[in-house]
């Protein structure tokens, strides 16, 4: 599959960002070990990555453990190959930052049409986009939709792409739309046993 010139430029920028992120995170992880526990939270490798890459940074992303993580947004025009760029971004992330073939990607889409088209494409093992994902995962790609069972084992052993429609997680659409947050027992493996 051939990328257009602007897509090559976008992926090139993304690769540079992932490489710089990995380098900065590794050096901060080393420095963090030398600090007392109460000071470790002050090291923000994400902010430093953006500063050294001369990219504007305003976000302060932390996970549930208070650890920093990078988040990026790509604006691509209609017909600009958003799905292809997303697949390439996942591949480069796996190779340059995560340095592993497994993990979880939450793929959020804006409409039912795009949702069904993208899920259909990426479930088809003959589709070039799916083949690119399979290359990145060592042929261990799982395409899941909201409501399907997901375990820690799935994420440890596969590259899991979890599709969600933005409307299904929006408070503006009422209680019925928020069923994504309802306990179904499908995520039990993510919590320690009592």
What are these regions (language model features)?
Residues 1-194:
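RecA-like P-loop NTPase motor core of helicase/translocase proteins
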């Amino acid at each position: 599959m051939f990328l257009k010139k602007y897509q090559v430029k976008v992926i090139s920028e993304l690769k540079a960002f992932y490489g710089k992120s990995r380098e900065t995170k590794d050096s901060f992880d080393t420095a963090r070990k030398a600090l007392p526990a109460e000071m470790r939270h002050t090291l923000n490798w994400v902010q430093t990555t953006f500063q050294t890459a001369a990219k504007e940074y305003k976000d302060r992303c932390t996970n549930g453990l208070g650890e920093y993580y990078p988040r990026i947004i790509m604006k691509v025009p209609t017909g600009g190959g958003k799905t292809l760029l997303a697949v390439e971004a996942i591949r480069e992330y796996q190779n340059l930052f995560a340095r592993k073939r497994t993990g979880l990607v939450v793929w959020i889409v804006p409409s039912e049409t795009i949702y069904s088209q993208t899920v259909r494409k990426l479930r088809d093992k003959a589709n070039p986009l799916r083949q690119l994902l399979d290359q990145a995962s060592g042929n261990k790609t799982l395409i899941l939709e909201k409501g399907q069972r997901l375990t820690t084992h799935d994420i440890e052993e596969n590259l899991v792409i979890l599709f969600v429609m933005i409307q299904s997680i929006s408070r503006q659409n009422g209680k019925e739309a928020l069923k994504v947050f309802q306990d179904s027992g499908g995520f039990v493996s993510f919590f320690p046993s009592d």
